[in-house]
Every structure is written in C-alpha cells, then in structure tokens.
Amino acid sequence: QLYPLGIACRNNDLETIKRLLAGKDEPMAMGHDCYEFDILYTAIYFNKEDVLKYALTRYKDINDRVYSDEYGLTLLTYAYKLSNVKLARILLEYGIHVNGYQSPYDTYKVYPIMEAIANNNIELVRLLLEYHADLNVKDSNGITPLALAKETGAKEIENLLLQGMKQQK
C-alpha cells in the first residue's frame, strides 16, 4: 500500500516529497501487512536515485538510525538484494556502513557481502571490497563470505574474496 509520500517517491516528485516532509512528523511512504517503510526504503524499492540522494541529505544521521526490516535487511543490503549497483554506490558514497547494521536482537543477520555473493553479483562484491567490507562476518548460520562463495560454486567471487583478505591483513 502506497501512502502519499510513497506515491510521490514512485513518481519522482521531489516538490511533493519536500512538502510532505516539511512538518515535524516523518510520514511513512509504504506499508505491507503490519510493516511500514520510510522514504529511504521506498526510494530503493522504486529505484529512484534523486529521491534517495535527497533523503540522504535530509537524514544525516543515517548510521544512527536503526534500519533493519524483519528479515535483517538494512538499506544497503536491500539495494544489494535488488542487485542495484547504482543505488548501493550512492549509499556508500553518503557514508552508510559497508557491513550494514546488525542488531543483536535481529533473528536474521544479513550482510551486504553475503547478499552479493548469494546473487553471484561480482560487480557488487567488487564495490564492497572497494569500501573495505569485513570479510570475516558470519551470518545467522555461522557462514562466512568465503564459505558461501565456495558453497555456491562462485569461483570468481571466491578468488576476489581471497585477494581482498590478503589486502586486509
């Protein structure tokens, strides 16, 4: 379900977005079941670069906000899940944590690097390595990025990770 902010986001209508965000309240943009999503998630969902950039300039505390949905997806992980290199780069350029935010209370721990490997997206793996992603993280099942690459048979990604691990030492 799209709320007025979500409709403006989908339509890339920055003037309406600015007007809707002018008040003290932060209206939600989209809802699904019992969950609601703000403009940042919605901009990624609709692949709206200008809206995402505007929202990132408006919310400078991006890493202090807890952005993690019920599946442990942070903004960056969500962009990776959608294989959106362009928006992932924008998030990283604006300083979002390269490893995402992992709350100790989340049932699932989903890291951007793991999502890139699971999708066999070499370009996204390279982007995370460029921003020095932690290659020693473990997901909810205790799997590391290298183990996942081996498990999925992603040989090129496995080689990239091994090179990245050497550089991080």
Outline where the language-model segments fall:
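Leucine-rich solenoid repeat scaffolds
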Residues: 136-168
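Eukaryotic tandem repeat interaction scaffolds
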Residues: 70-73, 77-91, 97-102
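Intrinsically disordered, low-complexity regulatory segments in ankyrin-centric signaling systems
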Residues: 1-23, 34-49, 53, 57, ...
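Ankyrin-repeat boundary/"N-cap" motif
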Residues: 1-5, 30-40, 65-76, 101-113, ...
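Ankyrin repeat domain, specifically the short helix-to-loop turn at the C-terminus of the second helix
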Residues: 19-28, 53-62, 89-98, 126-134, ...
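Conserved ankyrin/ankyrin-like repeat signature
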Residues: 16, 50-51, 86-87, 123-124, ...
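Ankyrin repeat A-helix N-terminal signature
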Residues: 7-12, 42-48, 78-84, 115-121, ...
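Alpha-helix initiation and capping sites
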Residues: 13, 26, 33, 48, ...
